[in-house]
Protein backbone atom coordinates (compact mmCIF):
# COMPACT_ATOMS: atom_id res chain seq x y z
CA UNK A 1 0.00 0.00 0.00
CA UNK A 2 1.41 3.43 -0.99
CA UNK A 3 1.96 6.22 1.53
CA UNK A 4 -0.81 8.32 -0.07
CA UNK A 5 -3.32 5.48 0.21
CA UNK A 6 -2.30 4.89 3.84
CA UNK A 7 -2.68 8.60 4.60
CA UNK A 8 -6.11 8.74 2.95
CA UNK A 9 -7.22 5.69 4.90
CA UNK A 10 -6.03 7.23 8.20
CA UNK A 11 -7.86 10.48 7.40
CA UNK A 12 -11.02 8.53 6.67
CA UNK A 13 -10.73 6.63 9.96
CA UNK A 14 -10.14 9.89 11.87
CA UNK A 15 -13.25 11.42 10.29
CA UNK A 16 -15.33 8.39 11.29
CA UNK A 17 -13.98 8.51 14.87
CA UNK A 18 -14.66 12.26 15.10
CA UNK A 19 -18.19 11.78 13.77
CA UNK A 20 -18.79 8.92 16.22
CA UNK A 21 -17.52 11.01 19.16
CA UNK A 22 -19.81 13.89 18.17
CA UNK A 23 -22.77 11.51 17.99
CA UNK A 24 -22.03 10.09 21.46
CA UNK A 25 -21.53 13.58 22.95
CA UNK A 26 -24.79 14.76 21.40
CA UNK A 27 -26.65 11.84 22.95
CA UNK A 28 -24.94 11.52 26.34
CA UNK A 29 -23.20 14.88 27.02
CA UNK A 30 -19.86 16.57 26.38
CA UNK A 31 -17.87 14.54 28.94
CA UNK A 32 -19.30 11.14 28.00
CA UNK A 33 -16.27 10.24 25.83
CA UNK A 34 -12.86 11.80 25.25
CA UNK A 35 -9.23 11.02 24.53
CA UNK A 36 -7.27 9.79 27.54
CA UNK A 37 -4.56 12.37 26.83
CA UNK A 38 -6.90 15.33 27.18
CA UNK A 39 -5.31 17.36 29.96
CA UNK A 40 -8.45 18.25 31.85
CA UNK A 41 -9.20 14.56 32.39
CA UNK A 42 -5.67 13.56 33.36
CA UNK A 43 -5.35 16.10 36.18
CA UNK A 44 -6.85 14.57 39.32
CA UNK A 45 -8.55 16.94 41.75
CA UNK A 46 -7.79 16.06 45.36
CA UNK A 47 -8.80 17.08 48.87
CA UNK A 48 -6.81 16.72 52.07
CA UNK A 49 -7.21 13.71 54.34
CA UNK A 50 -6.48 15.96 57.31
CA UNK A 51 -3.13 14.22 57.80
CA UNK A 52 0.04 15.57 56.18
CA UNK A 53 1.66 12.14 56.48
CA UNK A 54 -1.23 10.34 54.76
CA UNK A 55 -1.41 13.00 52.03
CA UNK A 56 2.29 12.40 51.34
CA UNK A 57 1.90 8.59 51.27
CA UNK A 58 -1.00 8.84 48.80
CA UNK A 59 1.39 10.35 46.25
CA UNK A 60 -1.14 12.86 44.85
CA UNK A 61 -1.45 15.15 47.87
CA UNK A 62 -4.72 13.78 49.26
CA UNK A 63 -7.82 11.78 48.39
CA UNK A 64 -9.11 11.98 44.78
CA UNK A 65 -12.46 13.60 44.00
CA UNK A 66 -15.18 11.50 42.41
CA UNK A 67 -13.70 8.21 43.60
CA UNK A 68 -14.41 5.45 46.11
CA UNK A 69 -12.04 5.12 49.08
CA UNK A 70 -11.94 2.28 51.60
CA UNK A 71 -10.39 2.71 55.05
CA UNK A 72 -10.19 -0.59 56.91
CA UNK A 73 -8.53 -2.03 59.98
CA UNK A 74 -9.15 -3.49 63.45
CA UNK A 75 -11.37 -1.77 66.01
CA UNK A 76 -10.11 1.44 67.63
CA UNK A 77 -7.30 1.85 65.11
CA UNK A 78 -8.26 5.39 64.01
CA UNK A 79 -10.36 4.74 60.88
CA UNK A 80 -13.29 6.98 61.84
CA UNK A 81 -10.92 9.68 63.13
CA UNK A 82 -9.24 9.89 59.70
CA UNK A 83 -12.66 10.12 58.01
CA UNK A 84 -13.83 12.86 60.40
CA UNK A 85 -10.63 14.86 59.81
CA UNK A 86 -11.30 14.58 56.07
CA UNK A 87 -14.82 15.98 56.58
CA UNK A 88 -13.32 18.93 58.49
CA UNK A 89 -10.95 19.62 55.57
CA UNK A 90 -13.86 19.52 53.09
CA UNK A 91 -15.78 22.04 55.21
CA UNK A 92 -12.74 24.34 55.40
CA UNK A 93 -12.95 24.61 51.59
CA UNK A 94 -16.68 25.49 51.85
CA UNK A 95 -17.67 22.00 50.73
CA UNK A 96 -20.53 19.85 52.01
CA UNK A 97 -20.26 16.41 53.56
CA UNK A 98 -22.62 13.69 54.73
CA UNK A 99 -22.05 11.01 57.36
CA UNK A 100 -24.04 7.78 57.00
CA UNK A 101 -23.88 6.50 60.58
CA UNK A 102 -24.86 2.87 60.07
CA UNK A 103 -23.30 1.93 63.42
CA UNK A 104 -25.24 4.72 65.21
CA UNK A 105 -22.05 5.65 67.05
CA UNK A 106 -20.95 9.14 65.97
CA UNK A 107 -19.87 11.41 68.84
CA UNK A 108 -20.81 15.06 68.05
CA UNK A 109 -18.46 16.39 70.76
CA UNK A 110 -15.47 14.51 69.34
CA UNK A 111 -16.43 15.57 65.79
CA UNK A 112 -16.51 19.20 66.95
CA UNK A 113 -13.10 18.82 68.62
CA UNK A 114 -11.66 17.71 65.28
CA UNK A 115 -12.84 20.92 63.62
CA UNK A 116 -16.15 19.77 62.10
CA UNK A 117 -18.99 22.26 61.85
CA UNK A 118 -21.67 19.86 63.11
CA UNK A 119 -24.45 22.31 62.20
CA UNK A 120 -23.52 21.90 58.52
CA UNK A 121 -22.86 18.15 58.50
CA UNK A 122 -25.60 15.98 57.05
CA UNK A 123 -26.13 12.82 59.08
CA UNK A 124 -28.28 9.77 58.47
CA UNK A 125 -28.81 6.73 60.69
CA UNK A 126 -30.49 4.25 58.32
CA UNK A 127 -32.42 1.16 59.34
CA UNK A 128 -30.94 -1.22 56.75
CA UNK A 129 -28.12 -1.65 54.28
CA UNK A 130 -30.45 -0.99 51.33
CA UNK A 131 -31.64 2.27 52.88
CA UNK A 132 -28.08 3.42 53.60
CA UNK A 133 -26.84 2.77 50.07
CA UNK A 134 -29.98 4.27 48.51
CA UNK A 135 -29.28 7.47 50.48
CA UNK A 136 -25.67 7.42 49.20
CA UNK A 137 -27.01 7.08 45.64
CA UNK A 138 -29.45 10.00 46.02
CA UNK A 139 -26.77 12.24 47.57
CA UNK A 140 -24.28 11.34 44.82
CA UNK A 141 -26.79 12.12 42.08
CA UNK A 142 -27.66 15.50 43.64
CA UNK A 143 -24.26 16.92 42.66
CA UNK A 144 -24.22 19.08 45.79
CA UNK A 145 -22.22 16.85 48.15
CA UNK A 146 -18.42 16.69 48.06
CA UNK A 147 -17.89 13.78 50.44
CA UNK A 148 -20.01 10.95 51.83
CA UNK A 149 -18.69 8.78 54.67
CA UNK A 150 -20.27 5.37 55.34
CA UNK A 151 -19.49 3.97 58.80
CA UNK A 152 -19.31 1.03 58.40
CA UNK A 153 -19.60 -1.62 55.68
CA UNK A 154 -19.78 -4.40 58.29
CA UNK A 155 -22.94 -2.80 59.74
CA UNK A 156 -24.77 -2.68 56.37
CA UNK A 157 -27.30 -5.40 57.16
CA UNK A 158 -29.58 -6.42 54.25
CA UNK A 159 -33.34 -6.15 54.83
CA UNK A 160 -33.78 -9.88 54.19
CA UNK A 161 -31.47 -10.60 57.12
CA UNK A 162 -33.18 -8.04 59.37
CA UNK A 163 -36.64 -9.42 58.60
CA UNK A 164 -35.59 -13.08 58.86
CA UNK A 165 -35.04 -15.23 61.91
CA UNK A 166 -31.73 -15.85 63.66
CA UNK A 167 -31.59 -19.42 62.30
CA UNK A 168 -31.96 -18.30 58.66
CA UNK A 169 -28.90 -18.57 56.40
CA UNK A 170 -27.90 -15.26 54.79
CA UNK A 171 -24.65 -16.14 53.04
CA UNK A 172 -23.69 -13.68 50.30
CA UNK A 173 -26.55 -11.21 50.83
CA UNK A 174 -24.29 -8.35 51.90
CA UNK A 175 -21.81 -9.01 49.09
CA UNK A 176 -24.59 -8.92 46.48
CA UNK A 177 -26.00 -5.74 48.03
CA UNK A 178 -22.60 -4.00 47.86
CA UNK A 179 -21.93 -5.19 44.31
CA UNK A 180 -25.27 -3.86 43.03
CA UNK A 181 -24.95 -0.54 44.88
CA UNK A 182 -21.38 0.15 43.73
CA UNK A 183 -22.28 -0.56 40.10
CA UNK A 184 -25.09 1.95 40.47
CA UNK A 185 -23.27 4.83 42.18
CA UNK A 186 -19.84 4.79 40.51
CA UNK A 187 -20.95 6.79 37.46
CA UNK A 188 -22.72 9.46 39.54
CA UNK A 189 -19.68 9.88 41.78
CA UNK A 190 -17.32 10.45 38.86
CA UNK A 191 -19.69 12.79 37.03
CA UNK A 192 -20.42 14.99 40.07
CA UNK A 193 -16.95 14.71 41.67
CA UNK A 194 -18.44 13.28 44.85
CA UNK A 195 -16.19 10.98 46.85
CA UNK A 196 -17.31 8.19 49.17
CA UNK A 197 -15.25 6.87 52.06
CA UNK A 198 -16.32 3.40 53.16
CA UNK A 199 -15.05 2.53 56.63
CA UNK A 200 -14.60 -1.21 57.03
CA UNK A 201 -13.54 -3.71 59.66
CA UNK A 202 -11.39 -6.82 59.40
CA UNK A 203 -12.46 -10.41 59.98
CA UNK A 204 -10.49 -13.66 60.16
CA UNK A 205 -11.18 -16.45 57.69
CA UNK A 206 -11.62 -19.80 59.38
CA UNK A 207 -9.19 -22.61 58.54
CA UNK A 208 -6.52 -20.54 56.78
CA UNK A 209 -3.11 -22.12 57.43
CA UNK A 210 -0.99 -20.31 54.85
CA UNK A 211 -1.25 -16.67 53.79
CA UNK A 212 -3.13 -13.80 55.37
CA UNK A 213 -6.21 -15.02 57.29
CA UNK A 214 -7.73 -11.53 57.40
CA UNK A 215 -10.51 -10.36 55.12
CA UNK A 216 -12.96 -7.45 55.00
CA UNK A 217 -16.78 -7.70 55.00
CA UNK A 218 -18.85 -6.79 51.94
CA UNK A 219 -17.40 -9.15 49.35
CA UNK A 220 -14.94 -8.36 46.57
CA UNK A 221 -16.84 -5.52 44.87
CA UNK A 222 -15.55 -2.78 47.18
CA UNK A 223 -11.95 -3.94 46.73
CA UNK A 224 -12.47 -3.73 42.96
CA UNK A 225 -14.27 -0.36 42.77
CA UNK A 226 -12.10 1.47 45.33
CA UNK A 227 -9.42 3.74 43.86
CA UNK A 228 -7.70 4.00 47.24
CA UNK A 229 -7.56 1.40 50.03
CA UNK A 230 -5.93 2.26 53.36
CA UNK A 231 -5.01 -0.35 55.97
CA UNK A 232 -4.97 1.37 59.39
CA UNK A 233 -3.29 -0.31 62.37
CA UNK A 234 -2.53 0.79 65.90
CA UNK A 235 1.18 0.29 66.60
CA UNK A 236 1.91 1.62 70.10
CA UNK A 237 0.39 3.65 72.90
CA UNK A 238 1.51 7.23 73.50
CA UNK A 239 2.38 7.79 77.15
CA UNK A 240 2.25 11.13 78.95
CA UNK A 241 2.96 11.29 82.69
CA UNK A 242 2.43 7.51 82.97
CA UNK A 243 -1.01 7.79 81.35
CA UNK A 244 -2.02 6.68 77.85
CA UNK A 245 -2.76 9.90 75.95
CA UNK A 246 -3.17 8.48 72.45
CA UNK A 247 -2.10 5.92 69.87
CA UNK A 248 0.65 5.74 67.29
CA UNK A 249 -0.92 4.42 64.07
CA UNK A 250 0.50 2.98 60.87
CA UNK A 251 -1.38 3.58 57.62
CA UNK A 252 -0.46 1.48 54.58
CA UNK A 253 -1.74 2.36 51.10
CA UNK A 254 -2.55 -1.18 49.93
CA UNK A 255 -4.23 -0.02 46.70
CA UNK A 256 -3.73 3.17 44.72
CA UNK A 257 -4.96 3.60 41.14
CA UNK A 258 -3.46 7.10 40.88
CA UNK A 259 0.08 6.72 42.26
CA UNK A 260 2.47 3.96 43.35
CA UNK A 261 0.88 1.94 46.19
CA UNK A 262 2.32 0.30 49.32
CA UNK A 263 3.63 3.52 50.84
CA UNK A 264 3.36 3.81 54.61
CA UNK A 265 2.43 6.79 56.78
CA UNK A 266 2.92 6.89 60.53
CA UNK A 267 1.08 9.41 62.66
CA UNK A 268 -0.28 9.94 66.14
CA UNK A 269 -3.89 10.23 67.29
CA UNK A 270 -4.28 12.09 70.58
CA UNK A 271 -7.40 11.23 72.55
CA UNK A 272 -10.13 13.91 72.24
CA UNK A 273 -7.89 15.96 69.89
CA UNK A 274 -7.34 13.73 66.86
CA UNK A 275 -4.33 13.63 64.55
CA UNK A 276 -1.21 15.28 65.96
CA UNK A 277 -0.38 17.64 63.09
CA UNK A 278 2.53 19.21 64.93
CA UNK A 279 4.14 15.79 65.34
CA UNK A 280 3.57 15.09 61.63
CA UNK A 281 5.26 18.34 60.62
CA UNK A 282 8.21 17.56 62.89
CA UNK A 283 8.64 14.11 61.29
CA UNK A 284 8.15 15.30 57.69
CA UNK A 285 10.58 18.17 58.23
CA UNK A 286 13.27 15.60 59.04
CA UNK A 287 12.36 13.46 56.02
CA UNK A 288 12.66 16.47 53.68
CA UNK A 289 15.80 17.80 55.42
CA UNK A 290 14.04 21.01 56.46
CA UNK A 291 15.12 20.20 60.02
CA UNK A 292 18.34 18.42 60.96
CA UNK A 293 18.92 16.16 63.95
CA UNK A 294 22.20 15.65 65.76
CA UNK A 295 21.98 13.53 68.88
CA UNK A 296 18.91 14.71 70.79
CA UNK A 297 19.02 18.22 69.31
CA UNK A 298 16.93 19.46 66.38
CA UNK A 299 18.26 22.37 64.34
CA UNK A 300 16.73 24.72 61.79
CA UNK A 301 18.83 26.94 59.51
CA UNK A 302 21.90 25.88 61.47
CA UNK A 303 20.46 26.88 64.86
CA UNK A 304 19.42 24.44 67.60
CA UNK A 305 15.72 24.94 68.37
CA UNK A 306 14.75 22.02 70.62
CA UNK A 307 16.20 19.09 72.55
CA UNK A 308 14.06 15.99 72.11
CA UNK A 309 11.02 15.34 69.91
CA UNK A 310 8.41 16.32 72.51
CA UNK A 311 10.07 19.70 73.07
CA UNK A 312 10.23 20.22 69.30
CA UNK A 313 6.50 19.52 69.02
CA UNK A 314 5.81 21.91 71.91
CA UNK A 315 7.93 24.57 70.16
CA UNK A 316 5.98 24.18 66.91
CA UNK A 317 2.68 24.30 68.79
CA UNK A 318 3.56 27.48 70.67
CA UNK A 319 5.39 29.31 67.84
CA UNK A 320 2.91 29.64 64.96
CA UNK A 321 5.34 31.66 62.82
CA UNK A 322 7.99 28.92 63.05
CA UNK A 323 5.38 26.23 62.36
CA UNK A 324 4.08 27.98 59.21
CA UNK A 325 7.60 28.65 57.93
CA UNK A 326 8.66 25.01 58.30
CA UNK A 327 5.32 23.74 56.98
CA UNK A 328 5.56 25.86 53.80
CA UNK A 329 9.03 24.47 53.09
CA UNK A 330 7.63 20.93 53.46
CA UNK A 331 4.81 21.82 51.03
CA UNK A 332 7.37 23.10 48.50
CA UNK A 333 9.33 19.83 48.78
CA UNK A 334 6.12 17.77 48.41
CA UNK A 335 5.06 19.78 45.35
CA UNK A 336 8.46 19.17 43.74
CA UNK A 337 7.92 15.45 44.32
CA UNK A 338 4.44 15.58 42.70
CA UNK A 339 5.52 17.59 39.63
Curated annotation (Swiss-Prot):
It is found in: Cytoplasm. GO terms for molecular function: ATP binding; ATP hydrolysis activity; ATP-dependent DNA damage sensor activity; damaged DNA binding; single-stranded DNA binding. InterPro entries: AAA+_ATPase, DNA_recomb/repair_RecA, DNA_recomb/repair_RecA_CS, P-loop_NTPase, RecA-like_C, RecA-like_N, RecA_ATP-bd, RecA_C_sf. One of its GO terms (cellular component) is cytosol. The keyword Secreted does not apply. It comes from the Bacteria. Keywords: ATP-binding, Cytoplasm, DNA damage, DNA recombination, DNA repair, DNA-binding, Nucleotide-binding, SOS response. The keyword DNA repair applies. GO terms for biological process: DNA recombination; DNA repair; SOS response. ATP binds at residues 73-80. NCBIfam families: tigrfam_recA. PANTHER family: MITOCHONDRIAL DNA REPAIR PROTEIN RECA HOMOLOG-RELATED, RECA. HAMAP family: RecA (MF_00268). Can catalyze the hydrolysis of ATP in the presence of single-stranded DNA, the ATP-dependent uptake of single-stranded DNA by duplex DNA, and the ATP-dependent hybridization of homologous single-stranded DNAs. It interacts with LexA causing its activation and leading to its autocatalytic cleavage. Belongs to the RecA family. This is Protein RecA. It comes from Mycoplasmopsis pulmonis (strain UAB CTIP).
Amino acid sequence: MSENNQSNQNNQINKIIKSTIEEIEKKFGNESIMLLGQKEKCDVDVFSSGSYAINSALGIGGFPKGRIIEIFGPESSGKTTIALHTIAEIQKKNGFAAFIDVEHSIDPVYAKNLGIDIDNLLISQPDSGEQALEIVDILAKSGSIDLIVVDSVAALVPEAELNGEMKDQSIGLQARLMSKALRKITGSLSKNKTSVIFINQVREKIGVVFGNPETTPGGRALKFYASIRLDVRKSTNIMLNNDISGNQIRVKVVKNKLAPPFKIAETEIIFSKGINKFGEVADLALVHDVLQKKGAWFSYNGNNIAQGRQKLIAQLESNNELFEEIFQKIVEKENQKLS
